[in-house]
Amino acid sequence: MSVLLETSLGDIVIDLLVDECPKACENFLKLCKVKYYNFSPVHSVQKNFTFQTGDPLGPDSSESDGGSSIWGLLEGPPKRTFSLEPPPKLKHDERGTVSMATVPSPHDPDQRIAASQFIVTLGENLDYLDGKAVIFGKVVEGFDVLEKVNEAFIDDRGRPLKDIRIRHTVILDDPFDDPPGLVAPAESPLPSKAQLATVRIADDEELDDNMDEESMEKLRREREARAQALTLEMVGDLPFAEVKPPENVLFVCKLNPVTQDEDLHLIFSRFGTILSCEVIRDKRTGDSLQYAFIEFENQKDCEQAYFKMQGVLIDDHRIHVDFSQSVSKLSESWRNATISKRSGQRGGFGGVASLEKKRQYRASDNAREKENDYTLVFDKGDKAPRRRSYSRSPQRSSNRDRRASRSPRRDSYRDPYRRRPGDRSHSRSPARGEYRDKDRGRYNHRERRRDDERYRERRRR
């Protein structure tokens, strides 16, 4: 009575102790027959102690129920677990001892219950497990696989960083009859979506054997990042999962609020040609947010600026320089704004490439361009703006004259120091002036006649 376990690290052959623990052996054999253990992960490894498996999903899955016995699969959840009594003569004194993982029954603490999970010892004389795990088999082949499991890289919870899974189970000999309702599948089933979701580093992925634990953890994080990127692509947040940040763009932060675009452009331009340099500002207030993006023409200049400008003092602030990667959203918004500016310079207007912003108001504007000369739109090249004539028609002039010479008292009230009530010499009507001149002429003529008559009279005397 033996079972062959095909694992991702090699094959293990287990001889079952059907006479000492028949119920545990029957449960294990029938679960292997229905391929229940296929793709089950080794979810706990304790170096030189044990490794544990048998849960198809593993404890990290939210859908895991911890596993089920064969009777639970056939008859329902009430039979998910079954009670076991540890054989008194069997001890965990040899490496490769196989036993069912048990827990105290919630109804009777002295009774142990089991489901589908089992453990395999990686050391000798492990009497701690006696009475807590029920022995039902021993490993007879595949001790090299046990050594590989024992040397596997694990995290702080004991889970291998690279998946170790049971791929297939093959029953070499089965002395037990099948329980009612058991139907063996014709072929091994494919992993379910819930099982695939528990993959960390696939068991078939080639890794460097010389990698330390830190490198393994880094690789695991990279795999998780790729999985998250694929999710973002599916929901439309990324154009494609393998999108990478630009390699010629620097992210500069910890800037002084007074630092301007021109200042950074001047400082960083010594490393190469800069396509764009922009300090990001608040859209509402226009205040500097104290970080900027600098786009170089080529990657080499960008890398040189990265190594030379880290921690440099600019406007009494030591700046931090990095490649645009961890701030991808900020970089994306800045890049979109830059592209829209460039498209506007190429002729696009209002987000429509077929429209063009009008650059002049009149056809003659180009002919009147002057250096250092600011003129109005309607000046047509006159250096000094012309003033409007306020006497455009005789009627308007006459009306204006009548309003201007209404009453001497009114004029006196307006400006008593400039005009007095008896001052009538400032006449605004040409006709009135002509009559006044005529009267003045007649008056002078009469005076001369009187003077002549007086002169004649004196001569006669």
Swiss-Prot record:
Catalytic activity: [protein]-peptidylproline (omega=180) = [protein]-peptidylproline (omega=0)
Localization annotation: Nucleus
Primary localization class, coarse: nucleus
Chain coiled-coil ranges: 205-234
Domain (RRM) ranges: 248-326
InterPro entries, per database record: CRIP, Cyclophilin-like_dom_sf, Cyclophilin-type_PPIase_dom, Cyclophilin_PPIL4, Nucleotide-bd_a/b_plait_sf, RBD_domain_sf, RRM_dom
SMART domains noted in UniProt: RRM
Region (Disordered): 341-461
Keyword Kinase tagged: no
Segments of skewed composition (Basic and acidic residues): 365-384, 398-461
Alphabetized Pfam families for the sequence: Pro_isomerase, RRM_1
Top EC class for this record: isomerase
Gene Ontology CC annotations of this record: nucleus
CDD domains: cyclophilin_RRM, RRM_PPIL4
Domain PPIase cyclophilin-type residue range list: 1-171
Keyword annotations from UniProtKB, A to Z: Coiled coil, Isomerase, Nucleus, RNA-binding, Rotamase
The EC number(s) this enzyme carries: 5.2.1.8
GO function term, MF aspect, one: peptidyl-prolyl cis-trans isomerase activity
Biological role stated in the UniProt entry: PPIases accelerate the folding of proteins. It catalyzes the cis-trans isomerization of proline imidic peptide bonds in oligopeptides.
PANTHER family registered for this protein in UniProt: PEPTIDYL-PROLYL CIS-TRANS ISOMERASE-LIKE 4 (PTHR45843:SF1)
Entry's family note: Belongs to the cyclophilin-type PPIase family. PPIL4 subfamily.
Protein name: Peptidyl-prolyl cis-trans isomerase-like 4
Organism of this sequence: Aspergillus oryzae (strain ATCC 42149 / RIB 40)
Encoding gene, per UniProt annotation: cyp6
